[in-house]
Amino acid sequence: MRRLLLLLPLVVVAARMQIEWLWFNQFNLANVLLERWLLQVLLAGVAMLPLLAARAWSRQFRQQRLTSSQGISLRGWPYGIALLICAVVVLISALLTLDLLALAISDPFQLGDWQSNVWPHSRIGSVVKLVQVGGIGLAMTWLRLRPWLGRIVAASWVVVVSRTWGIWSLALWIPNESTKDPLLGADLSFGLGRFAGLHLALDLLLLGATFTLVFELWRVLASSQAISDWASPAFSPRQMRLIRLLSALLLFGAAGLVWLSRHQLLWTQHGLVAGAGWLQAHMTLPLRGFATLLLLLMGLALLLPCQRRLRQFLALALATLVMLETLATPLTRWLVVRPREFALQERYLKNAIEATQWGFQLDQIKSQVDDPSRFSPTDREEGASTLENVRIWDSGPLLEANRQLQQLRVYYRFSNAAVDRYPLNQDSDSSQQVIVSARELDQSALPRRSKTWQNRHFIFTHGYGFTVSPVNERRDDGLPSYFIKGLGTETKIAGNPALGIERSEVEKEIPVGDAALYYGMLPSPYAVAPTDIAEFDYPEGDINVMTHYQGSGGVPIGTWLQRCSAAVYLREPRLLFTNAINADSKLLIRRDVRSRVKAIAPFIDFRGEPYLISIPDAQQGSSNRINQNSNQRQQHQYWVVEGYTHSSTLAYSAAVSPDDSDRYLRNSVKAIVDAYNGSIRFFVSEPEDPIVNAWIRGFPDLFEPMQAMPLLVRDHRRVPEDFFNVQVNQLKRYHVDDPQIFYNGDDVWQVPSEIYGGQKINVEPYHITAQVQGNNNSEFLLLQPLTPLARPNLTAWLVARNDGDHYGELELIDFPKDKIILGPEQVQALIHQDPDVSEQFGLWDQDDLELVQGNLLVLPVGSGLLYVEPVYLRTRKVGLPSLARIVVSDGRLVAMDQDLNLALDQLMKKAPPV
């Protein structure tokens, strides 16, 4: 029986390994999983080496007989203090090891900065923490349990080292950047990849050595005889040599950490300088260099025979250095730096500006000054392509309308609405902007009686279909217009005569097909398909249309061995007793696309909301083939997931915010996930990023160059709004190149505010279709207006290009500083001051009706600026928004109508001749 119990963990591990292997194998990436396993086994073996050394040290220490008359012993209060210190250190080091273990299991890539992720923000609850303290205390006092405490700490140490394979791999694989930091001369790759590995290695070695030394001392001091006598047995000379040996190792490790702390100064904010300033360069760095030398000498003094006075002198010198850094640093800052701060800090401010611009790709911005004229009929004619695609539907109101008009059943959910573009009008040089929203299955919305095990895992397995709406059109009743709506055989595909778009073009460019969505944004439980039980596909009137999964994705569980492994993996014994599973059945797991791609590439940070694309002929020809593993059915729907590499240890780069410590960020990976089969491909969008190049070096079969991305998918690339927002945030202060202007702070920008739905919010970036200087064709752009700090007038805007070879390029349009250009908040005030508009708003916003002013857009049209704001009406009870009016302004006059062109006609009539 005992042997069976010992075999049980092995059975669980074997089952999990089999399911993971089969899951990776469906993508032909089993070699990636095997490499990760081998790395973890190798690291576990490496971690065993210091543990074996610690065990040998402990064995040597215990072999020496302790006496009460020979050697060094402690009595009275010194003994009591030593006993207390040992108890506290053993408790803290054991708790810290368990916290590191918890972090290594939950998110091992956070261990590179474990100090800010473990304490004080421990991931273990207070009750569990109390249980841990009680258990450790019991093991320390109960002689029979004491060896188990050491074994648990040692095993935890091995698991932590093994689980952090990503940190060690990045440190080994990252290539040199060939750019050095301006103060210490280290290659930038040291901070981006190697520092975390070195620091963690020293931390773990120090933690292990500390626990080993103090645990053995505690074993001696806490013996029943010692406590009874309130005196420790005497330590023999050999034991003292062993103690000095391990103490010297601790000093050498501390010297390494102090040396590395010199580099930490380069990515720590010091006043205005995002890194080491004059004070750190001329005082802190030398002091820490001397401290490193003293720690090394102290370690050598413990190993080599020398006089006691020398050791005391070295300890006193180290204490003096610590006092100097603690006390002299603020005095020097006050007496020396503050009186002539800019003169001393100019060089370091320049370093911070250049590093921050490089860290967030602000150095690639192309700047130009534009002096916009007043909007005129000529601008209206020249900017026709921009006006054709003005977004009058915000994502929020359209999503709410979708939920009320197109969810169709209680268990469907539209979780997001993404702006995209499709070439629907062959007579136009620009693509049609649309909002795409996927209809996913939300199992949490199933009625309670329907939440049976069979329903959740065998029948309700997938969502179905999506809606596509033009951003610039509405129905006569004010509700959204649709190119695609409905689902199943009742899916309606329509053109739009007002936009010059025919139904055939919509069918060609946005194919629907059998739009079953087995993978999506919403968290979904595992599904088993196909089985002998038919799956719910979509409703058709009062009838439910059923289907069977025909995709290539999933883990095969047709054999009994596979089914047993799946039951163990999911902790679901019912899989063993159901008669529904057949030889073709597969287990579909990790159906949330973000967790799906994260499981394969945990070293890439997948942020933001994925967005759905639907493209034609995705599998015809090698250049357009997305799902290379499936020949069962033609699939049109795919999810695009944005992946990032980031670092908080780039020298002199400023952190994004107090809550976001990133000092380096790249949108380096784009993952494409088949919404039906679940297949995944990873494309590298930043080939010059040293971090992603490290992972390419380690896993060459995982990544593909952007040139390998099918053209149909490449046409739907977008600069992620998350990444763009970070760039805008850093640009607000770091758009200047002159350290004097930066120091004075007289050219700081901010994101403007607007009133949306009665609340004051920051203006979010929005997509427009417009021409960029030097390109005669209109492009799909992401735009963010900017205003001076504490002033509402417009000062600049940042534009990200999304089309073709210009993808990712940034254009900064500066407006003349001597000219007043109204910002969004000022234009909204102008709108409310217009008597006709104000009167109409007052008539609407009363009783059961609620008026919602949408996002105010500032648009470059021709050589002028045009402000456009949609106005929605909704009842307070039902909340179905309808587009009531469109307000336009040229910055002086305001006009409003039900149609954009009619509103522009009114504006032109009001405007004096130019």
UniProtKB/Swiss-Prot annotation:
<feature type="transmembrane region" description="Helical">
    <location>
        <begin position="123"/>
        <end position="143"/>
    </location>
</feature>
<protein>
    <recommendedName>
        <fullName>UPF0182 protein Syncc9605_1323</fullName>
    </recommendedName>
</protein>
<dbReference type="Pfam" id="PF03699">
    <property type="entry name" value="UPF0182"/>
</dbReference>
<feature type="transmembrane region" description="Helical">
    <location>
        <begin position="37"/>
        <end position="57"/>
    </location>
</feature>
<dbReference type="GO" id="GO:0005886">
    <property type="term" value="C:plasma membrane"/>
</dbReference>
<dbReference type="GO" id="GO:0005576">
    <property type="term" value="C:extracellular region"/>
</dbReference>
<feature type="transmembrane region" description="Helical">
    <location>
        <begin position="195"/>
        <end position="215"/>
    </location>
</feature>
<feature type="transmembrane region" description="Helical">
    <location>
        <begin position="240"/>
        <end position="260"/>
    </location>
</feature>
<feature type="transmembrane region" description="Helical">
    <location>
        <begin position="4"/>
        <end position="24"/>
    </location>
</feature>
<feature type="transmembrane region" description="Helical">
    <location>
        <begin position="285"/>
        <end position="305"/>
    </location>
</feature>
<feature type="transmembrane region" description="Helical">
    <location>
        <begin position="152"/>
        <end position="172"/>
    </location>
</feature>
<feature type="transmembrane region" description="Helical">
    <location>
        <begin position="81"/>
        <end position="101"/>
    </location>
</feature>
<dbReference type="InterPro" id="IPR005372">
    <property type="entry name" value="UPF0182"/>
</dbReference>
<keyword id="KW-0812">Transmembrane</keyword>
<keyword id="KW-1003">Cell membrane</keyword>
<keyword id="KW-0472">Membrane</keyword>
<comment type="similarity">
    <text>Belongs to the UPF0182 family.</text>
</comment>
<feature type="transmembrane region" description="Helical">
    <location>
        <begin position="312"/>
        <end position="332"/>
    </location>
</feature>
<keyword id="KW-1133">Transmembrane helix</keyword>
